[in-house]
């Protein structure tokens, strides 16, 4: 086979004369102890006499004995086609060579002997033979400095040699076959490519079976524009680099791409002549040097071989900082390897690299990724929109305890995220810059899609944390140091996908969404997100952010501009108190016609239309609803029964902020219109006054007291009284404010469920007011004392009903409290499935509960006493459920046996009993209790 040759000179040599292959042999240093140095020992060291050293022989190589120098064109062709065979032949001849077996020729043999003596190990038995002179054809730094198996055995004198007198990465026997070596300055691999050098345990010479290394090694191949070597090595040089991690780790079973040796050698694109500016590694000079490394390797490795494609300087800066700050790369790893980094190092975990910045084959993806202590490290973050502070904050924060803040920020600006242990490792994400494909292995992609904790960590890296000041200008926000996703402000809608399908699709979506003020999305981005964000950022100013329709609406009137008399319906000037409410003439006529005409108005909106002086005619349904809520009833004409002076003073009390002094006889009425600073000012008469005005008149039973009482006559008289009271309940409920807003079916249902409770409650109130609870005052013509109760057939039932007036006497219930409790009894039982107008029903019930509290406050002073009073009254309402159930059962039994008992039941009462009492007794209704039993 032909031998690997270097190309023509790119710069004039330093010898001062034309290069000639016959000048001499270069000074070859003693190779660093190989991985199998212990297998071959030598008891004695060769004695070499002093020889003169030729400078030309030191700097320029020459061909082997008996070999003619080749022309430059032939050398270029052989250098490309024999990359695989060069390293294999060098390994095949190692077992036959020795330190003194080379035939001396001119200065070459003597110089090699001198170097063998100078660079011999210090301990006995550590001498190692060198390969034959003419077999190793590589004049390049193919594998970098070799690490000896025993680091202390490395020669100490090797570090003091001049960089030009030592071969940083060549083998020890490279004395011939390198005629063109003087044309190219020997150089080592860049620090970023040292990560993939073969381990120290891998074979280097022949005689040992070659094993594929877990990571492919990198071979630099020079490419010259217009050279004829493109025909044979075109795919290796012009094509995109390929990751060989999967093939190399497979034990050699997988197919190896062209240009890769059995040991996993991968081709690395050579630097272009247009980019020759070196980049010096300043920190590596102070870092401890790995055992077996030469000073030349440290110097030449600082030159970064820039590819032809345009570079992203931000990513290069981040990568350089990574390589310079990690001293573990050059510190040595003992018998393991100094160039294959341990699993816990950042270099072993952060393998993916963007195409166009570094060759992909130099950073193959890890086939078996594992978590380590460097979570936020690597090249998985896109370098777009980054600055120096962000680079430090996103990468160095995970490697060192230092915290990198935004320029001008202090630690107090990040109170929510104290420095702590690094968050869990996010999986490697594919590069997201436009025009770049994701270069990841299948196992790595699978680990990305199966990781559930990656979303939270990647999210905190890409998005600004809540509480952190936003980055101004076109820069991206600083990374979030929160351990979880809960600490970030923006939602997950715009998060990029980290699944394997997204990696195979190509470019990922933009990782930095457009941000507006304080990190919020722009106005045209997402309205829902903006609204949610404003609630967190601008809570005191949300009232100012109203739609245009609401912004134009102002209060109808203020307290300062309140006229003496205004309409409580539309806000116009009031003409007087009509139907119990201070209204204008227009609303008065509207309410009268609506109630008398029995119109069924329907709102076209949501029953929340605005009713004012201008828009009061737009929606009659909402206008009528507002009239009923204000308390307008047709029975409001009963206000005429009051003294005219008293009514006028009541109206003045509504219009003026301070109550007007009135005579003592109207002190109770004045309390209803007296306002205190802690109470809500109401611009309409209290609801209690309306309840007083609609209270039914006295109803007579029509019982003939001249005849002796019989069971049938007494029960028949009570049924006739019940019929009349039922009609009175229907009329009263229709005049009740808010009751007409319910569905007509709900109105009927409530009356049928509560008519018995209302009648027995009214019985107790009349007994309490007229006879102080000593008798049962059914009607003025039907009053049962205890003697008549005993003579009746329902004495036990009379004793049950007698408990109510006795409770009234005990609690001294006022009329206002009784009226509010009576309304609550109407709203105290509903069907199990609920009402059709359930929402309106609950609002109505809540309003009357508040009225009961106000009625209690008229007499009780203090919060404690008012609370106790409210508990006592509501407890009485709850106890009525059990009492009324006994009445229902007796009434149903009497109705069933009416013919046998000769008891008459009126028509309406019969319908209600037959339709509803079986359901009530069967438990098909839901009683609304204030307290749990």
UniProtKB/Swiss-Prot annotation:
Extent of Pro residues compositional bias: 418-433
Region described as AF2: 687-933
Chain location of the short sequence motif LXXL motif 2 per the record: 115-119
Residues the entry annotates as binding progesterone: 766
UniProt PTM comment: Phosphorylated on multiple serine sites. Several of these sites are hormone-dependent. Phosphorylation on Ser-294 is highly hormone-dependent and modulates ubiquitination and sumoylation on Lys-388. Phosphorylation on Ser-345 also requires induction by hormone. Basal phosphorylation on Ser-162, Ser-190 and Ser-400 is increased in response to progesterone and can be phosphorylated in vitro by the CDK2-A1 complex. Increased levels of phosphorylation on Ser-400 also in the presence of EGF, heregulin, IGF, PMA and FBS. Sumoylation is hormone-dependent and represses transcriptional activity. Sumoylation on all three sites is enhanced by PIAS3. Desumoylated by SENP1. Sumoylation on Lys-388, the main site of sumoylation, is repressed by ubiquitination on the same site, and modulated by phosphorylation at Ser-294.
Cross-referenced PANTHER family: KNIRPS-RELATED PROTEIN-RELATED
Protein name: Progesterone receptor
